[in-house]
Amino acid sequence: MLRSLGLGLLLFALLALVSGDNDYVSCNCDDEGFLSVHTILECQRVSDLLIAIAYFSIPLELLYFISFSNVPFKWVLVQFIAFIVLCGMTHLLNAWTYYGPHSFQLMLWLTIFKFLTALVSCATAITLLTLIPLLLKWKVRELYLKQNVLELNEEVGLMKRQKEMSVQVRMLTREIRKSLDKHMILRTTLVELSKILDLQNSAVWMPNENRTEMHLTHELRANPMRSFRVIPINDPDVVQVRETKVVTILRKNSVLAVESSGCGGSEEFGPVAAIRMPMLHGLNFKGGTPEFVDTPYAIMVLVLPSANSRVWTDKEIEIAEVVADQVAVAISHASVLEESQLMREKLGIQNRALLRAKQNAMMASQARNTCQKVMSHGMRRPMHTILGLLSMFQSESMSLDQKIIVDALMKTSTVLSALINDVIDISPKDNGKSALEVKRFQLHSLIREAACVAKCLSVYKGYGFEMDVQTRLPNLVVGDEKRTFQLVMYMLGYILDMTDGGKTVTFRVICEGTGTSQDKSKRETGMWKSHMSDDSLGVKFEVEINEIQNPPLDGSAMAMRHIPNRRYHSNGIKEGLSLGMCRKLAQMMQGNIWISPKSHGQTQSMQLVLRFQTRPSIRRSILAGNAPELQHPNSNSILRGLRITLADDDDVNRTVTKRLLEKLGCEVTAVSSGFECLNALSNVEMSYRVVILDLQMPEMDGFEVAMKIRKFCGHHWPLIIALTASTEDHVRERCLQMGMNGMIQKPVLLHVMASELRRALQTASE
């Protein structure tokens, strides 16, 4: 373009120079007619003026263009402007040379401007010669820029296609993730992908549970001729697709392609592509990281239509791969949600079962507590009353036989009270075990009382009774007196109930180590523990049934033999259970209990071996009945005249406890509730030194009464002593925390009551 402009300007300058020549000597012009010399000169003059005007306007336009644009080679344009201006001046001066003689000045200026025009035109021509190579280089660069523009257009087109693909994939992904149901996700994928890629058909194949077959579970256009399609998982195309991460183009005769086309072999179909989709489940994840497990794969098959000879493009393949990844993620999320819902349902069922179990346990616990309260009220309290009365009888003056009978009754009642406490206070967390109450006691007294009870039972049931007690038995031993007496009573009852009357019962007590060879064989078989320390002693209790050698002929004895006996031969389960419980008790006391059968399996004797810790003792005959007490009782002078308030809601127990306190010389005011106790303490005229409270009173229990007493009466006086039937250890600690000074555990015995009162008074006076 610039070269054409330069050539045009050069030709224009040459014509201007030619037109400025005024030498008309050789002109042979005709002066007649319209085209006369004068007319021609006028036309040339007008033309020169118009050319001058045009030459003067063109530089102005170029100057305006240069001032408002940034074009290269401005100095070339400046040369053109000078050349055009000089040409214009030449034409302007030449217009005055057509009439008459010319002045010297006009010819001089015309010559000067022509000379300048010649110089400028030559300079411009030379400049164009140097500029043409640069212009040619510009042309090459223009071609290069055109090539770059074409490449940029291709890249822009690719970016537009990628953007379009991303938009389509995003729309498809949004449609897929609208649902969290696996079947809806797959159905939506097939429909939307078919719209985007203009597919003839699409299908999804799922593996079965055993991973031996691929089942056609979802299809865009199902073939009505076949309702179910199965392909073996070891099919070559299936294996190839499952082992490849990218899209696989299937063969025309592929079973997977034919079965997924929806044509059934009757119609043509286009190229078929297949890609695998991992089917991850929630169990494959731990902390968000998949385990290295054999992941099952589904296969998505996409079929193009046969028209227009379409093939799979890179864009379509990329869309299929991206969609397959998105479907795998969506299905894994749906699987996790489904499994979480199932887990939530299972947890809900378990929670409801736990709530029902908790309610049942609370109801059972409530029923157990209610039963314990009823049993405590119906069994404990009467037994506590009996024990309290017997303790009063023990302090009275009696004959030796009466004292033995009262002591036997006291011991039996104590054992029965312990059994009742075991039944009522036993806790499931204790596994049915009862704690031992180990203390020092008189073994002679225990044997004497057991023999008294055994003789009474034997005579009542028509048996004779004999007693064989070793004289060198120690008196003071350490062990559980109640449990020992309980086991001995069980042996007597068991032997008497398992045989008929008319025989003799022998109650034998010996020191271990002096028995027969049969006893030694028992020890050798490990029936009791023999590896104890030297300061322990083994005592063997035995109850044996023997035939009467010379039966008495008096009527009383004969009458006793016909007394009906209670027998339990048909209740072997209860007998075994009782024997097992007694064996556990004996083993807890480092001993054992067993039965020695005679001929034909008939029970004839029962042995019990127990271990006791020995202490220095006074060895006296048991039958003499004058064994000393463990300790001499302290004087009750400190208790005489002591003002005591007794609060117990049970009338019988309150009366017995009041009688025990009065026997100790105390002045007792008995009330039946906590409110009456507080009213009695508010009486200024009566200054009570001791308050005895039953902890299980209704309306206001003993703890609440004690708290109110300490709040209004002070922290030191009156002394507060609790009465409770509970055997739990934490009760005493709670009593001390509530400001009480002592605790007496029911049954209330006379010597226990006196000892606790003396201890509390002595502690308070210190």
Swiss-Prot record:
Cofactor: Cu cation
Domain Response regulatory positions: 643-761
Consequence of changing T117M: In ein4-3; ethylene insensitivity
Modification comment: Autophosphorylated predominantly on Ser residues.
Domain (GAF): residue spans on this chain: 181-331
Keywords: ATP-binding, Copper, Disulfide bond, Endoplasmic reticulum, Ethylene signaling pathway, Isopeptide bond, Kinase, Membrane, Metal-binding, Nucleotide-binding, Phosphoprotein, Receptor, Serine/threonine-protein kinase, Transferase, Transmembrane, Transmembrane helix, Two-component regulatory system, Ubl conjugation
Binding site for Cu cation: C87, H91
Principal cellular location given in the protein's record: endoplasmic reticulum
Induction: Not induced by ethylene.
Pfam families noted in UniProt: ETR1_N, GAF, HisKA, Response_reg
Documented EC number(s): 2.7.11.-
Topology class, membrane: Multi-pass membrane protein
Tissue: Expressed in embryos, etiolated seedlings, leaves, roots, inflorescences, stamens, pollen cells and tapetum cells. Moderate expression in carpels.
Sequence similarity: Belongs to the ethylene receptor family.
Protein name: Protein EIN4
